[in-house]
């Protein structure tokens, strides 16, 4: 008997930088390319963190939209999960990209919400 499985990848994470791992995909084009390679290898779900030019974490909805567009073009069946994490950012900032999450599953870390966010 074969048990179906979903392979998911988190290609970047929120903490590592290129100084930690030179091959880390941090730009939009690098993230699309890395996601496409994972898709071709069998991954069905990708968890996305976007970065600012200085490689620090970002909640920029436009960056998420660019990554989403590239993934849709090259990996049409892939499930995309945007990270809503964001140390030091408000819940509304961290969730601003959700308007672009039409074809995926957003992730919201309840442990990061404060009483004032609920």
What are these regions (language model features)?
Residues 9, 28, 32-33, 45-55, ...:
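Histidine-centered catalytic micro-motifs
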Residues 4-10, 45-47, 77-81, 105-110:
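Structural preference for beta-strand elements that scaffold enzyme active sites
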Residues 10-14, 51-53, 83-87, 111-116:
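Active-site beta-loop-alpha junctions enriched in small/polar residues
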Residues 19, 44-66:
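Glycine-rich, proline-tolerant flexible connector loops at the mouths of alpha/beta enzymes
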Residues 1-23:
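N-terminal small/glycine-rich loop or linker at the start of catalytic domains
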Residues 89-118:
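Extended substrate/RNA-proximal surfaces in nucleic-acid metabolism proteins
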Residues 31, 38, 49, 106-109:
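Conserved, mostly hydrophobic/aromatic
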Residues 3, 9, 56-82:
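Alpha-helix-loop-beta-strand connector modules within alpha/beta enzyme cores
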């Amino acid at each position: 008997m074969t048990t179906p499985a979903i392979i998911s990848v988190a290609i970047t994470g929120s903490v590592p930088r290129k100084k930690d791992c030179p091959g880390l995909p941090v730009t939009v084009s690098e993230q699309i390319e890395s996601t496409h390679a994972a898709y071709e290898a069998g991954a069905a779900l990708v968890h996305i963190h976007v970065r600012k030019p200085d490689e620090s974490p970002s909640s920029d909805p436009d960056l998420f939209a660019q990554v989403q567009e590239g993934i849709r073009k090259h990996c049409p069946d892939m499930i995309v999960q945007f990270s809503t994490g964001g140390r030091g950012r408000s819940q509304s900032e961290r969730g601003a990209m959700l308007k672009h999450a039409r074809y995926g599953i957003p992730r919201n870390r309840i442990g990061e919400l404060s009483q004032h966010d609920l």
